[in-house]
């Protein structure tokens, strides 16, 4: 009986002791009950208790977020440096990942949340981030080289049209400079990378690049003037020969036009720069002109360069209208003098004085040394139908109607529908439909 009473008293003492401990601040929990959750602190920040109800410090990964808690159990927000690495947390404490725009700048955070700096190869392209992590846009000098980054951030490659001009960036983002042989042609880039268009002065001479940046070769019309560039693109000056055509390229490279005095001699050039020998009462045959005549038909002679075109024109004309007479072509100084004297005498035989006869003769016969026939480039072809056909088609063979109707005051010769002068198709086709005689076309009036 006494032993049983002692056991009961001992049990009561234990229960009273436990009760006293509980009232002293001790709590007892079931270890299998989840006590995790958020707690709003007095300063407005949050802390988090884990499964056992213990406040968390350091990293915490939940199903929908990753957060970080400082040593005071507070969840951090904004920029944070943790273990010498930079991170960013939103106002809700969530770790920033991937692209984030903050205060007007873009940043990139890796899958681990670490802020990326320097060069970064991303799916959208290659980017560069400053030491503060801000994404670079537009021009940036990096380790002594200049790069351009698109407004969206990727490093520029290939062609880029920028405010200062056009650039080409290689796969490393370096812009090209100097002469570059590209797939579609040669271009030139200045030291600052801008593609050249227009004129370029180099040590060996002048070059010209079109609006697409291609180096020009051959003939080019630039601001109404004609220039010639060799196969390397170098602008040419001085005399330039192309088959039967001669050009004079002035000091600035432009082809001479109109009347020009060169080394004491008078030359005439078309609006496109082709030299044409002009012979009339004011322009005798120049000393530099050389004859090289061959047989055109029967006993008629013609300058070698005009032989084949004249023969073809005659064949085609006769095939079209049936006949075409060949009256006259090349004449020597002696022959021209004899014609002038004979014609003058014929007029005198009608009762004219010598002066009257001479003046009448000059309406159709040129003074020796000023006759087109002495060039060996003209032919008098007869027949009404033939002349009509030739007036329409002579241009196709390189000939012009030398003395058209209504131009006597300029040419000094009345209309001669039979007189055709060879100038080459480059000139004849350009003159066609202009309504100009040769003097007008060459700027000699």
Q: Locations of the language-model features?
A:
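Extracellular adhesion/carbohydrate-binding repeat motifs centered on closely spaced tryptophans
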Residues: 2-275, 308, 392
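Extracytoplasmic cell-surface/polysaccharide-interacting catalytic and binding patches
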Residues: 10, 32, 263-265, 270-445
């Amino acid at each position: 009986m006494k032993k049983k009473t002692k056991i009961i008293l001992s049990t009561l003492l234990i229960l009273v002791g436990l009760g006293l401990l509980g009232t002293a601040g001790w709590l007892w929990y079931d270890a299998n009950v989840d006590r995790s959750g958020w707690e709003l602190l007095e300063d407005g920040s949050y802390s988090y208790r884990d499964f056992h109800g213990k406040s968390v410090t350091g990293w915490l990964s939940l199903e929908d977020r990753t957060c970080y808690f400082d040593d005071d159990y507070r969840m951090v927000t904004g920029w944070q440096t943790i273990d010498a690495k930079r991170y960013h947390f939103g106002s809700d404490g969530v770790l920033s990942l991937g692209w984030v725009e903050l205060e007007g700048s873009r940043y990139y955070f890796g899958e681990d949340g670490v802020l990326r700096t320097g060069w970064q190869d991303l799916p959208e392209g290659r980017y560069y981030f400053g030491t503060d992590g801000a994404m670079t846009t537009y021009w940036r000098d990096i380790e002594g080289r200049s790069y351009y980054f698109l407004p969206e951030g990727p490093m520029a490659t290939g062609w880029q049209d920028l405010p200062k001009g056009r650039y080409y960036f290689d796969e490393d983002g370096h812009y090209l400079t100097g002469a570059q042989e590209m797939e579609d042609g040669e271009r030139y880039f200045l030291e600052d990378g801008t593609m050249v268009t227009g004129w370029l002065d180099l040590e060996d001479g002048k070059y010209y690049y079109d609006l697409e940046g291609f180096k020009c070769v051959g003939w080019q019309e630039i601001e109404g003037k004609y220039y010639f560039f060799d196969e390397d693109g170098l602008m040419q000056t001085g005399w330039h020969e192309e088959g039967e055509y001669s050009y004079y390229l002035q000091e600035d490279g432009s082809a001479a036009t109109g009347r020009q005095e060169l080394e004491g001699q008078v030359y005439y050039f078309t609006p496109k720069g082709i030299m044409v020998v002009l012979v009339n009462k004011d322009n005798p045959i120049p000393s530099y002109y050389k004859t090289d005549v061959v047989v055109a038909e029967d006993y008629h002679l013609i300058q070698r360069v005009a032989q084949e075109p004249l023969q073809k024109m005659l064949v085609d004309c006769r095939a079209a209208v049936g006949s075409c007479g060949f009256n006259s072509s090349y004449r020597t100084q002696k022959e021209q003098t004899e014609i002038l004297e004979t014609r003058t005498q014929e007029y005198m035989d009608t009762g004219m004085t010598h002066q009257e006869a001479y003046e009448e003769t000059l309406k159709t016969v040129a003074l020796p040394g000023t006759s087109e026939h002495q060039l060996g480039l003209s032919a008098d072809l007869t027949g009404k139908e033939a002349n009509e056909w030739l007036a329409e088609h002579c241009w196709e063979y390189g000939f012009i109607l030398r003395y058209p109707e209504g131009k006597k005051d300029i040419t000094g010769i009345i209309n001669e529908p039979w007189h055709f002068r060879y100038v080459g198709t480059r000139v004849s086709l350009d003159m066609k439909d202009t309504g100009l005689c040769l003097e007008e076309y060459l700027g000699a009036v």
